[in-house]
Amino acid sequence: AQSAKQVISLRVKEAEKNRQYEDFIEKQGQILSGIIKRLEYGNVIVDLGKAEGVIKKDELIPREILKTGDRVKAYCYEVKKELKGHQIFLSRAHPQFLAKLFFQEVPEIYEGTIEIKAVARDPGSRAKICVHSQDSSIDPVGACVGMRGSRVQTIVNELHGEKIDIIKWTEDLPTLISESLSPAEIQRVLIDQDNKRIDIILTEEN
């Protein structure tokens, strides 16, 4: 009887682990929020309620200070199933963390009126995001910035002061490259389609 109870108990635990895995695999690619439980060798362990997530040291924003008990947001980039359970990997440095923050703060992006075309980040320093509006009457850059900068400022605060350049997407590649590399002054953009190479010539001051 004792052996049967142990088998049932193990199966219940296994079923619970599988259910938790299924719950979190659906959240992969989303922003999760939790309380910092502890710090281990520079990694941050986050209590997500029914499970723990880990933000590895190299997935943190450089120079940000996180403490036990703080509430933290992070992007769930991988849920890995293992024999002892599952691991939930989180990131605050991932480019998609920035993209998903814009999804949360800008209704036009959430609704699909504005599309995020590209994202690049130097975490903690500068980020660039290219946006395109499906509706010609809506300025994608203005919508992302918000009234008096309210929308983008919320994201900047979450990223501890990371400067965010919002760029209007264009099919004209030289123009897009020039806008993306601002504030550097571009003299010329040379595109070699055959060799898939782009040469950028800056003005002498740069």
Regions found by a protein language model. Give the residues of each.
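RNA-contacting regions in translation and RNA-metabolism proteins
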Residues: 1-206
